[in-house]
C-alpha cells in the first residue's frame, strides 16, 4: 500500500544560554538593530511627522448684499460717481452719489444645498455727458467651512478695471477662491475673521478708503479673491442708457490646508515605520537563524517537545 504525506509541521528548535552570555548579548543587539534603525530611517527621510495636510470641501458661501461702487468718469479730472449699501458712506459722497439699480441671484446648480454661483447686475444711471472709464467694486460674502474645523469668516471680492475708451458695460466671469497664508486647525471653531470687511457704521471717510480696506483685508491669513475675472469692456453707450456691470461669480470646491491632529500624525508615522520595519524583521530573522544554527555564539540546542508528549512525560 502506497503511503502519502498528508500533514507536516516544522520541528521547533530552541537555543539555551545564560543571560550574561555572548548569545544573550547578540540577541539583545539584534533586537535593537531590528527596531531602532527603521525609526531613524523613517525620521531622516523628511516627512515622518505629518506637519500639514489637505482635503477638498465645497464651502458654504452666501452673498451678503453689501456693495461698494466707485465709477471713474472721464469728463473731468477727479470725476467719479459712488454708491454703497452703507448709508454713512452715501452721506459722505454728496454730489458724487448716484443710486444704481441692483439685482442679485444665487444659484445652486447641483442641488446639494450649497450655492454654486452668484449672478450680479448693477445698472448705474448716467447723464449724456458722463462717460465711465473705470470701475472699482467690492462685494462681501459669508464664507464657511465645516468638514474639519468650523471656519467662519466674512470675505470680499474686489474688482477693479479701467480702460482708455468710455464703456457701456463691464462683464466679469470669475471664481471666488480661498487664499491661505497659514493652514487651518483640524477641529474646533475659528471665527477670528468673522468681522465685517467694511465698517459700515463709521462716519469717517477714511474708513471707506479702498486702499485702506484692501490693505487691512490683505493682513488676514485667510482671504478670498476673485480669480480669472476675464473682464470684457463693451463700448458704445446710448445717450440715456445706464452703465451696466454684469458679474458671474462661482463658488468652486476648494483644497483646504490644515494642521493634522495627534492621531492623524501617529497614523501617518506608523505606516512609514512599519513598512521599513518589515524589511528589517525579515533580514534579522535570517541572520539570527544563521548565527544560532551554526553556533557562531555558544548555545545549547534543544528540540522543543510537542504539547502532548510534554503532558505524557509529566504524568509519568
Curated annotation (Swiss-Prot):
Keywords: Cell membrane, Cell projection, Cilium, Cilium biogenesis/degradation, Glycoprotein, Membrane, Transmembrane, Transmembrane helix. GO terms for biological process: camera-type eye development; cilium assembly; embryonic digit morphogenesis; in utero embryonic development; neuroepithelial cell differentiation; regulation of protein localization; smoothened signaling pathway; vasculature development. The gene is TMEM231. One of its GO terms (cellular component) is ciliary membrane. Part of the tectonic-like complex (also named B9 complex). Interacts with TMEM107. The chain crosses the membrane at residues 23-43, 262-282. This is Transmembrane protein 231. PANTHER family: CHST5 PROTEIN, TRANSMEMBRANE PROTEIN 231. It comes from the Eukaryota. It is a multi-pass membrane protein. Glycans are attached at residues 194, 199, 221. Transmembrane component of the tectonic-like complex, a complex localized at the transition zone of primary cilia and acting as a barrier that prevents diffusion of transmembrane proteins between the cilia and plasma membranes. Required for ciliogenesis and sonic hedgehog/SHH signaling. Belongs to the TMEM231 family. Its main location: membrane. It holds the Pfam family TM231. The keyword Transmembrane helix applies. The keyword Glycoprotein applies.
